[in-house]
From Swiss-Prot:
The EIIB domain is phosphorylated by phospho-EIIA on a cysteinyl or histidyl residue, depending on the transported sugar. Then, it transfers the phosphoryl group to the sugar substrate concomitantly with the sugar uptake processed by the EIIC domain. GO terms for cellular component: membrane. One of its GO terms (molecular function) is protein-N(PI)-phosphohistidine-sugar phosphotransferase activity. It is a single-pass membrane protein. It comes from Mycoplasma pneumoniae (strain ATCC 29342 / M129 / Subtype 1). InterPro entries: Glu_permease_IIB, PTS_IIB_1. It is found in: Membrane. Residues 42-117 form the PTS EIIB type-1 domain. GO terms for biological process: phosphoenolpyruvate-dependent sugar phosphotransferase system. This is Putative phosphotransferase enzyme IIB component MPN_268. The phosphoenolpyruvate-dependent sugar phosphotransferase system (PTS), a major carbohydrate active -transport system, catalyzes the phosphorylation of incoming sugar substrates concomitant with their translocation across the cell membrane. Keywords: Membrane, Phosphoprotein, Phosphotransferase system, Transferase, Transmembrane, Transmembrane helix. It is an enzyme of class 2 (transferase).
Length: 117
């Protein structure tokens, strides 16, 4: 009797295991063609502009997928500490140009800065 019970356990759990493996493989092979892009900016755009020295300090704006590349008329007006308080992930300076590592909402930020100018 115990032997039949053990055979029943092995068969039932074996079939359950095979079913779960097949289901996991099917889920792993599904293609994900959706690109997730955030449309919410986690800080006030006016605070960002103020920390960059005001609207008139912006010369040009460009974006990469996660970075905002800005050329300033007077780079000495940029307040690094104020920008870091806004939660900017990285700030790289090269001559009059700054690269702000922000995230995938950089296109929305660029549009709002251009609308404010």
């Amino acid at each position: 009797m115990k032997v039949l019970l053990w055979i029943g356990y092995v068969l039932s759990f074996g079939l359950l295991y095979l079913y779960l493996v097949k289901r996991a493989k099917r889920a792993a092979l599904q293609l994900n063609n959706k690109l997730v892009e955030s449309h919410t900016i986690p800080f006030a755009v006016r605070d960002f502009i103020a920390a960059c020295g005001g609207r008139t300090n912006f010369v040009s704006l460009r974006t990469s997928p996660t970075q905002l590349i800005v050329s300033f008329a007077k780079p000495e007006l940029v307040q690094i500490a104020a920008l870091q308080k806004l939660g900017i992930k990285g700030i790289n300076k090269s001559q009059n140009q700054y690269r702000f590592v922000l995230g995938n909402f950089v296109n929305q930020l660029k549009q709002q800065i251009e609308n404010e100018r």
